[in-house]
Amino acid sequence: MLKRKCYIYPVKMSTDVTDSEFDEDAISQTEGEITYDRHLPAMHLYLGNNFIDAFGSRLFYEYDSILREIPIVFEENVVFWPGQTIPLFATSPDTCKALKYAIRQFIEMCLVYSVENISCSIIAQVLSYRIANEDGVEIVAVRAIGRHRVHIDSIETTIFENTDILMARDAKILIDYVSRNPLDYIRLPSLDRIFPGKSDVDWSGTSNTNTFPMVEKFYESKFTTIPKWILNRLDLSVLINNILEHTRDWYNTLPITNSPMDVTDFSFWVASILPIEAFRKMNLLLVSDARTRLERVLAILEKMYHYNEIACGLCEIDIGKVDDIISMSSNGPTGVYVNTASFMHEIVTLKSVRNIEESGRPKGSFSWFPNYKWKLLACSNCGNHIGWKFITSLTNISPSVFYALTLLKVRCVIDSSSY
């Protein structure tokens, strides 16, 4: 089973764009290959330097394990996933104390989407942290990673530094499994070794010449009344290959082989990068069967590409196209970032947008994409703040311009079916 790892790469920040050398008028849209180092945004360097590595090995709990108590952090704007990198930044005294308590006592925390959805939350492990005092204000910055889905039985409080800290009581690790192919139920287990079908996923983007012909792969279908096209649709390798085919264009030159090859981890990863509303992601997170989750992900992707439209969430005017989505981070075309006000945004990056208005001068402070400066974007029809324009004048970086839209304010158009 191949697990994703979080790598910290050495970075020279001296090449960042300064105000004195920035000339917005000299910037033009750049098409073609992306040359930007897309590992930089995934490292969340804007959180600052001098992070301390959290001690401890990878957290792993058996299914149905009970955690008697664990600190809670509410984040109502974003649904988090196992395997996802999670940035946290706090300046308010209560939140700072909650994060310090989680760091010092547990090295883990429970991230809750909303009070109504405590039935399924995420256990996150602290990878590194920074506690500092800047201009008289205490800040706590954390880099964490999602580990397990968890069900919270109840929420109570405990006292830390004269502050009430929310605690999850009797949190139960939820089971994740992969349901069997329908044909597996009519095949003798002793025949598994001579029938293919368990490793036909085209992770590399090239055809697998070692797989058996489909007619042999579905040999047992001769003994059922189930049409072959239905069995083909339900086949796990076909399902994953269809999903990879829909998402491959988002990556440009970034190898998609970075995606996890364990089926359950892959289902978490591909669901996390979908540019859809939080309630739809929550419904996907509630699913225990990875096969079912992947089927629903594929259905959403097919509808997204059918309508091929990203609209303002307030007035529904056309803002962009699904075809224009690109990955400016090694984590994928979407990502979770936090601003100086501790507000979390899940964004999707595009190479072009329409019906937008820019405001302000480009700023480089707290930039989520090192070497880029940002400007505010608003819907030209209703004035709704929808995201940011990122620009660079460095000639060795492509693209010179791209756009990040917050999924709180825009939505990919799909039909009204809810998953």
Predicted regions: what they are:
Residues 2-311, 318:
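N-terminal low-complexity, acidic/polar interaction/targeting segments
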Residues 305-419:
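A short Gly-Trp-Pro
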